[in-house]
């Protein structure tokens, strides 16, 4: 009997709570959650239609979506204004770099069909931070969008060992390195790279303890980052993303840390990677790097608050 009275009281409290919501409550007109019903398009939605969907066949999702998210992690929605800024940056620095180096049709064919933004990062059980993921070449998830400083965009291309805690955040590390890395995975899933690459460091990968490794230390073993030392597919993608987002001087800093033995290994891997992109995709990696670096420099002068 006591239970029934409690249930009735709880029901009344819930109903009262709903009725107490005032019509005068001020809410942002733009929802950060994706509704199952058709939402009215705003200016940003129309811009994405013209610059992403029509040109590259990409559905750029900035509203939080349960079906696009991994519900086993606690994350928050991406900020609306920062989503706009990142969409402008991704278009200029990433999409148009490949369009310039290869073609727009190439990107339209191979880019993921969905780019989903999330405001916060997600963390694995081993303490590692997930910056982005690619799912079968169909979707790329980008995390930590709310860390972007719209008025002080910064892309570090000269020091691969800069602290990741520096503010404003380095968009290369937190976004573009990740996007190049994940796109490399997509391409290698379409066309396999030389299996010789796998054997170069077969005995030295840190499959279970890479998170405890130091970037400078693993350079001596022939890895550009600690994550590269986790396994050969990540190794390949990390070399690619690191090479094209760093100046020759930045790459040389890695070789300096690698020493003679590590440099031999890194150059061996780099040669195989360059040949793969040249023969499989007709991409000259040094030309690609020049374009990426130029567009990275241009990004700091972009108006990230105005859709054009």
Q: For each predicted feature, which ranges?
A:
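Active-site recognition of the HExxH zinc-binding catalytic motif
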Residues: 142, 156-194, 237
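Acidic/polar, low-complexity intrinsically disordered N-terminal segments immediately downstream
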Residues: 5, 22-108, 261-308
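Metalloprotease/metallohydrolase-associated module, dominated by Zn2+-dependent proteases
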Residues: 204-308
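Second-shell loop/turn segments in exported
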Residues: 72-80, 147-150, 161-170, 174, ...
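Auxiliary, metal-adjacent structural segments of Zn-dependent hydrolase domains
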Residues: 26, 84-149
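Acidic, glycine-rich loop-and-strand cores that form catalytic or ligand-binding grooves
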Residues: 176-218
